């Protein structure tokens, strides 16, 4: 498979990600590709179609469809990655600041922390239901483990404690 256009370039990169076992990342690239193809209305997208004006129009298209700024950013960064690889290989023209006019940052409006009084009441609450007590204990442990992700907590085993020290590998990053 050649990378003669953006679609082929992205499909090849998605294939490599899957071979490397990076399935979530591959899905993210596939979602970006599907979205950009819908926007373009094309099955083959020449690299020259990726220009400042079309990227601005694509951003407006995504926002009009109700996508969040973080989705816009993710899709733009996925397209930029593959486009930059094509530039390095001489398959796409180098355009200075090509992605400057579109959002590629991270927007965080939502607060992710519990207020201290709510956390304290959850950690000290008394529950009659044994399942709720177990859940509260898990919450307390995850908090005491400095905000350990639930997926990491769920994969813990007795063998993870060595010499009084908890050792584990992150599920997300290995």
Positions of predicted regions on the chain:
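Basic/aromatic-enriched alpha-helical hairpins
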Residues: 1-65
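Short, leucine-enriched amphipathic alpha-helices that occur as contiguous helical runs
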Residues: 29, 75, 132-136
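N-terminal DNA-binding recognition helix of tyrosine site-specific recombinases/integrases
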Residues: 35-36, 64-98, 148
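Surface-exposed alpha-helical interface segments used for non-catalytic interactions
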Residues: 53-56, 77, 120
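Conserved helix-loop functional segments at active or binding sites
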Residues: 64, 88, 121-128, 159
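Basic, Lys/Arg- and aromatic-enriched nucleic-acid-binding interface segment
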Residues: 97-150, 154
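Conserved tyrosine-mediated DNA breakage-rejoining catalytic core shared by Y-recombinases
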Residues: 155-174
């Amino acid at each position: 498979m050649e990378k003669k256009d953006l679609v082929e370039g992205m499909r090849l990169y998605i294939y490599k990600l899957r071979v490397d076992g990076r399935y979530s990342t591959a899905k993210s690239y596939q979602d970006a590709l599907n979205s950009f193809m819908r926007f373009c209305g094309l099955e083959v997208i020449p690299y020259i179609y990726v220009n400042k004006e079309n990227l601005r129009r694509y951003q407006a298209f995504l926002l009009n469809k109700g996508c969040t700024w973080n989705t816009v950013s993710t899709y733009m960064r996925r397209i930029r990655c593959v486009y930059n690889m094509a530039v390095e290989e001489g398959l796409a023209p180098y355009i200075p600041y090509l992605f400057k006019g579109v959002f590629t940052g991270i927007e965080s409006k939502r607060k992710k922390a519990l207020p201290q009084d709510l956390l304290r009441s959850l950690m000290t609450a008394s529950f009659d239901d044994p399942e709720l007590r177990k859940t509260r204990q898990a919450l307390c442990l995850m908090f005491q483990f400095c905000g350990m992700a639930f997926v990491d907590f769920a994969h813990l085993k007795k063998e993870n404690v060595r010499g009084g020290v908890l050792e584990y590998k992150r599920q997300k990053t290995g």
